[in-house]
Design a protein with these regions (language model features):
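Flexible glycine/acidic-rich beta-alpha junction loops that bind and position SAM and/or redox cofactors
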Residues: 196, 216-242, 261-285, 358-363
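Conserved PDZ fold ligand-binding element
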Residues: 19-37
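Structural preference for beta-strand elements that scaffold enzyme active sites
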Residues: 147-149, 185-187, 218-220, 266-268, ...
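Conserved Radical SAM active-site core
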Residues: 61-62, 69-215, 225-254
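Radical SAM enzyme core and accessory elements
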Residues: 7, 278-439
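Terminal peptide-recognition signature
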Residues: 17, 25-28, 53, 97
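PDZ/PDZ-like groove recognition
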Residues: 1-12
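Short, Lys/Arg- and Gly-enriched loop/turn segments at beta-strand edges
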Residues: 35-42, 61-64
Length: 439
């Protein structure tokens, strides 16, 4: 197999790499005489005040660049392959895996299951640790790469093997202990499945993982997502409002213990639990800086707080404006209330909030981030949309104007014949977009 070459894709403006005349198409061969395996090696070897970088130019010439810099100063290089190596796929067959629940006919990358520790550091992905060798763990410790985000799900070894359908999954506590002993900061995640790892099993898991605090900085508990495409898969049941209330009670009990010991709440319930239980969201101080927001923990609280702060800073006026807002079923009531607050302050602003039901994955999928272009198009055609449609950015692929079903933003814009304003994931941008501000 041909060895991966580390080809430069982009050189940042005013960077060391630009100063040293490194250009797109160049290949980084060595740093300080060391061959580079992947992004771990690269980041480790550039952390010095003096480095020597061997570069091969497109014409075959090799340059040895001597660089003086600050210890932790980056070179300003982006590579064609962000990992600088092949991606590691998942070895598990988790009973709750959402990728297995995708409908047929989607783009190939949607079906790829990654479980690569390097993506944990680069992108914040959560990994199970089951495909890591001892030398991989030792390498993370040696390079002190952090934080590492771990999909734990349960600390019961036998149960974890069953849930992940992997006979090697039961060593999770040993792995976490090694990271704890080395002082490697961690975050954890539990995908909760009714009747499987909830109740007493959840209590056990939280208690065990709290033993790694404060090195393990946070733990999120999220409900399993259940689509309509589960034929032949493990039977899973949705949680009801009573279940949600029980989960919250368990978590909040441990939060009190954690706060007394560590000064943080440690374990957090995702927003979905509070909405389904009909309970108010905790205050911002309960989220410990929103360390788990990417897992749906504190999104509503953060959005609302930012929204009210931004709205309070804008003086009321008599502008006339009509717009529409797309949202998923889960947070519809919250978004509707925020829209009403804008209408109260700006008497001539009219906002239509549309709750989009997820026909693509199934009606049990209620989060906004899994809405597709075709569902939005189908459910908004013929509706009053006003001067613009506000669309949350998490409905689109990162850095691309494309939905999960491969519909493009231009196709949706053409179908609905309306200006589309992409709302960033903060309350201030929601206010700005709703009253006609520029993006």
């Amino acid at each position: 197999m041909k060895k991966q070459e580390h080809v430069v894709k982009k050189v940042l403006e005013d960077s060391i790499a630009q100063e040293m005349e490194i250009e797109p198409g160049d290949v980084i061969l060595e740093i300080n005489g060391n061959k580079i395996v992947d992004i771990f090696d690269y980041q480790y070897y550039i952390e010095d005040e003096y480095i020597e970088v061997l570069v091969r130019k497109p014409d075959g010439d090799e340059w040895l660049l001597e660089i003086d810099k600050d210890y932790d100063e980056d070179l300003g290089i982006e590579f064609e392959n962000s990992l600088m190596d092949d991606y590691k796929s998942c070895y598990n067959k988790c009973i709750f895996c959402f990728i297995d629940q995708n409908p047929p006919g989607m783009r190939d990358t949607i079906y790829f299951k990654d479980d690569d520790s390097r993506l944990s550091f680069l992108q914040g992905n959560y990994i199970t640790l089951t495909n890591m060798k001892d030398e991989d763990v030792d390498r993370i410790i040696r390079y002190h790469l952090a934080p590492i985000n771990v999909s734990v799900h349960t600390t019961n070894p036998d149960l974890r093997c069953k849930m992940l359908k992997n006979r090697f999954a039961g060593t999770i506590m040993d792995r976490l202990q090694k990271f704890y002993d080395a002082g490697i900061p961690m975050n954890g995640q539990i995908v909760l499945c009714k009747g499987i790892n909830d109740g007493d099993e959840l209590r056990r898991s939280i208690s065990d993982l709290m033993g790694f605090a404060p090195v393990m900085e946070s733990l999120s508990v999220v409900p399993v997502g259940i689509s309509d495409y589960r034929d032949g898969l493990f039977k899973l049941e949705p949680f009801d409002s009573r279940d949600a209330a029980e989960v919250i009670d368990i978590i909040e009990g441990f939060q009190k213990q954690a706060y007394e010991k560590f000064g943080t709440h440690f374990v957090h319930a995702s927003d979905e639990w509070y909405i389904n239980a009909g309970r108010p969201m905790p205050g911002a101080e309960n989220y410990d800086g929103y360390t788990q927001i990417e897992n749906g923990v504190g999104m509503v609280r953060s959005l609302c707080d930012e929204f009210y702060e931004a709205l309070g800073e804008i003086p009321a006026d008599d502008r006339e404006y009509t717009a529409s807002i797309v949202t998923g079923v889960l947070v519809y009531d919250h978004i509707k209330k925020l829209a009403e607050e804008i209408e109260k302050k700006f008497k001539n602003v009219k906002l239509h909030v549309y709750k989009i039901v997820n026909d693509f994955f199934g009606h049990r999928i209620t989060v906004t981030g899994l809405l597709t272009g075709q569902d939005i198009k189908k459910q908004l055609q013929g509706k009053e949309l006003g001067s613009r449609l506000l669309l949350p950015e998490n409905t689109l692929k990162c850095d691309e104007e494309i939905f999960l079903d491969d519909m493009t933003l231009d196709e949706l814009r053409e179908a609905l014949q309306v200006e589309i304003y992409i709302v960033k994931s903060n309350g201030a941008d929601l206010v700005n977009g709703a009253i006609g501000g520029n993006s």
